[in-house]
């Protein structure tokens, strides 16, 4: 699995948005109803949707975030087969960072619950990808 980071890429290449988020100084992770692991909020871009709108929609749906500040960090790509890429071809996404100050009590997605962690949880859904996203956001001064 290879993860690469870019200052920018052609917008048409961006297929998903992933949002590193903190609330109360802690990392925000989601637990999917069908998995025993934790993941960073995010998801696929809908046809005709701006990638920034994808990020806002996914953050709200998966975490119940109501009050937040969100900003783009960088574009990135993942090459290699994983749960959402059965071809292994390079796929591009946009990484965002959000500070959440208020949550809705009800989730509107496939997520079972939202958890706050001081450190990254050990049981990650994408252990070869998620730590690299956090590291890159830190390198760029976001965390």
Feature map (PLM): residue ranges:
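Conserved Nudix-box catalytic region and its N-terminal flanking loop in Nudix hydrolases
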Residues: 22-61
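Short helix-loop capping/hinge motifs at secondary-structure junctions, enriched
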Residues: 27-28, 101-107
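A short coil-to-beta-strand element that immediately follows conserved catalytic motifs
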Residues: 66-75
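NUDIX/MutT-family hydrolases
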Residues: 95-97, 105-140
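Short connector loops at helix/strand junctions that flank enzyme active sites
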Residues: 14-16, 22, 33-35, 40, ...
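Active-site-adjacent beta-strand/loop module that shapes the phosphate/pyrophosphate-binding cleft
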Residues: 76-104
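Conserved hydrophobic "DFG−1" position in protein kinase catalytic cores
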Residues: 19-21, 29, 98, 116
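Acidic, metal-coordinating catalytic segment for phosphate/diphosphate chemistry
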Residues: 1-18
């Amino acid at each position: 699995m290879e993860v690469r980071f870019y200052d920018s890429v052609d917008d048409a290449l961006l297929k998903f948005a992933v949002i590193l988020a903190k609330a109360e100084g802690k990392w925000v992770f989601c637990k999917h109803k069908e998995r025993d692991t934790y993941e960073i909020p995010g998801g696929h871009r809908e046809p005709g949707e701006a990638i920034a709108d994808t990020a806002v929609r996914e953050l709200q749906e998966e975490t119940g975030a109501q009050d937040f500040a969100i900003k783009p960090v960088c574009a990135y790509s993942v090459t290699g087969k994983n749960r959402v890429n059965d071809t292994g071809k390079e796929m591009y996404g946009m990484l965002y960072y959000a500070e959440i100050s208020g949550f809705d009590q009800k989730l509107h997605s496939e997520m079972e619950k939202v958890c706050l962690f001081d450190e990254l949880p050990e049981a990650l859904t994408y252990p070869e990808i998620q730590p690299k996203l956090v590291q890159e956001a830190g390198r760029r001064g976001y965390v």
